[in-house]
């Protein structure tokens, strides 16, 4: 066979193979490659959405954490204020109670002083009568001289 005829036969076979490949083999390969490219693109898009969702979730979590910390700080502040007001109220109540107890004690002391003075006046009056009795060497009648004794008590 001639080189030209062989070359032409090979060209014909090559073009038939190329035509068959382009008609029957190439479209399924291209479809498979397109599907694969689409899956890869979808996967990348999903990854980007996942990243953006993650970033948004982190922002929401940070915002929630911040608001929870602020709420906790507010509650702590409110509790401290309430505790301080309770302490102040207790101090005020204690001061009022102390003042009341002191006033009661002073009133009791004044009453006791008055009672002791009255008792002392009675004793002094009795001693004065006894002294006068001894001086006069006679008995002084207390019933008769009650006005005199009361006046003496008042002077003392």
Curated annotation (Swiss-Prot):
GO terms for cellular component: plasma membrane; proton-transporting ATP synthase complex. It is found in: Cell inner membrane. GO terms for molecular function: proton-transporting ATP synthase activity, rotational mechanism; proton-transporting ATPase activity, rotational mechanism. It is a single-pass membrane protein. SUPFAM superfamilies: F1F0 ATP synthase subunit B, membrane domain. Its main location: membrane. F-type ATPases have 2 components, F(1) - the catalytic core - and F(0) - the membrane proton channel. F(1) has five subunits: alpha(3), beta(3), gamma(1), delta(1), epsilon(1). F(0) has three main subunits: a(1), b(2) and c(10-14). The alpha and beta chains form an alternating ring which encloses part of the gamma chain. F(1) is attached to F(0) by a central stalk formed by the gamma and epsilon chains, while a peripheral stalk is formed by the delta and b chains. This is ATP synthase subunit b. It comes from Herminiimonas arsenicoxydans.
């Amino acid at each position: 066979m001639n080189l030209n005829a062989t070359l032409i036969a090979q060209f014909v076979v090559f073009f038939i193979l190329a035509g068959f490949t382009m008609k029957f083999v190439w479209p399924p390969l291209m479809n498979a490659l397109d599907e694969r490219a689409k899956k890869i693109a979808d996967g990348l898009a999903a990854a980007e959405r996942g990243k953006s969702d993650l970033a948004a979730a982190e922002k929401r979590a940070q915002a929630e954490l911040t608001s929870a910390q602020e709420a906790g700080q507010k509650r702590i502040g409110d509790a401290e204020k309430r505790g301080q007001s309770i302490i102040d109220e207790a101090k005020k109540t204690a001061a009022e109670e102390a003042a009341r107890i002191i006033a009661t004690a002073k009133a009791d002391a004044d009453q006791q002083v008055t009672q002791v003075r009255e008792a002392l006046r009675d004793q002094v009056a009795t001693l004065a009568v006894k002294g006068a009795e001894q001086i006069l060497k006679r008995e002084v009648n207390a019933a008769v001289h009650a006005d005199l004794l009361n006046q003496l008590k008042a002077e003392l």
